[in-house]
Design a protein with these regions (language model features):
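ALDH superfamily catalytic-core signature
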Residues: 1-102
Length: 102
């Protein structure tokens, strides 16, 4: 997803979160990269972070759950390894899901 400087930040953030996290991130068209061009980067990252922080994570059978948990400890470990790898390569972790408390 590419977000240009004249984009509607709220619409772009809503779209990015929906595309990345909708259907528990298991869509064949789920996104994993958002390219923010120019000055839009900081407000977009903040808007996406706010939305992710407010996702309701819980069992899929609970009506208010928006995202289910990872299916196994093995899967969680793999995700943690991806986050650690990105951080080691210089990425800034904005929403850290390694130790989810909900």
């Amino acid at each position: 997803m590419v977000v240009l400087p004249d984009a509607d930040i709220d619409l772009a953030a809503d779209s990015a979160v929906s595309a990345a996290y909708g259907s528990a991130g298991e869509r064949c068209m789920a996104i994993s990269v958002v390219v923010a061009v120019g000055e839009v980067a900081e407000p977009l990252v903040n808007a996406i972070s706010d939305r992710i922080d407010n996702l309701k994570i819980g069992p899929g059978m609970q009506p208010d759950s928006e995202m289910g948990p990872l299916i196994s400890e093995e899967h969680r470990s793999r995700v943690v390894d991806y986050i650690n790898s990105g951080e080691a390569e210089g990425a800034t972790v904005v929403c850290d899901g390694r130790m989810h408390s909900r």
